[in-house]
Every structure is written in C-alpha cells, then in structure tokens.
Amino acid sequence: MKYINSFLFFCVIVLVGCNQQPTFTISGTITDGQDQKIYLEHTSLVGTTIIDSCVIENNGKFLLESAAPEYPDFYRIRIGQQSLPLIIDSIEQIQINSTLAELSYTQDISGSESCLQIAKLRAIARKASRDELREASKQMIVANPASLVAYYAVFLKQNGLAVWDITQASDRRLFQAVATSFDLHWPDYDRTI
C-alpha cells in the first residue's frame, strides 16, 4: 500500500509538471507609473494582441507573464501612448527599470541581449544622424542576420522614414541576408520573408 501511494503521488507530480507550459516574465519598476495600467502586447504580422496586463504598484513595481512563444517574436509593453518594443525568445526573465516619460527609450534592460540591442538602436535613432544609425544598424544586421534584431533593424525608421530602402541595390543586400538567414533557420516561421 505504501508503494502504491508513493507511485500515485509520483504520477500526479509528473502529470502536473507536464501540463505546465513554459513562460517568460517581464518585471521591473516604472518609478512614476504608480496606479497606471501596463500592458504586455504581442506584435504579430497581422496586428497587436494584449497578452497580459497589471496595475503598477505604489512602489512602481510590475510583473507581466505569458506562455513562451514557439519562435522568438516581437512584443511590447505599453502604458498609455508610451511603449517599449521587446524581443522574446523562450523562457526569458526580463527586467526593465524606467520612468514613464523615458519608457520608449530606456536602456535599463536586463535578461535579454536582443531587447537591449533594439533599445540601443532606438536610442541612436532618437539622437544620432541618419548615417550613424545606418552604420550601427548595419553592424547589428551583419553580426547575426538570422536574429530578430537584424529583422528589426532592416525595417527601422527614423523620424517616420525608413532607414533602409529595398529599392536600392546596396540596401537590398541587407534585406536579402536577413531573408535568406530566416529561410535557412526558420523556414516555417511566419516572419520568414
């Protein structure tokens, strides 16, 4: 009887563990965001979907959570009109600290190198010349054309204008590098061009 109870307990633990889906979390502090609602949104090719939300605590802390995606993909956190794009890959635990006013440009991000890289690109786009932004984004594209950072970089805009122009032969090579890399690494991914 003792062995049967132990076996049943073991089976229950295994079944519970198998039913739990892997998740990722985004947490942090928005110092002046108390009592505001923060949203976690998935940004797909067909639109944006709210995945999770919470009210920021009095001390500015928040926690958002969702099931891990099958492929790395784009998400964002949003408070009102302020948003921060993120790349989520698997079961990451991302930490973000910012003020509400600087949320869209914060670089105080840990737990995801991809998120930090696109935050750096956004900061460069905000303050640097077009040539400096082109050089910085080109380096990120060439370094890993199969990454979502490269995908983000080829579609990057500065002041509402595309940084890269697919109709220009020199720019087209970067688009081709990303498209070919995605096709090789993720042929069934919906972002494969």
Regions found by a protein language model. Name each.
Residues 145-161:
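Amphipathic alpha-helical repeat scaffolds of TPR domains
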Residues 137-141, 154, 179-183:
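Amphipathic alpha-helical segments within well-ordered protein domains
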Residues 17, 162-165:
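Secretory-pathway/luminal and periplasmic proteins that interact with or process carbohydrate-rich
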Residues 169-193:
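N-proximal helix/coil linker or "cap" segments that precede and/or mark the start of modular domains
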Residues 141, 145, 167-170:
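Structural signature of alpha-solenoid helical repeat scaffolds
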Residues 18-144:
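A non-transmembrane, solvent-exposed segment enriched in polar/low-complexity residues
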Residues 1-29:
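Bacterial Sec-dependent N-terminal signal peptides
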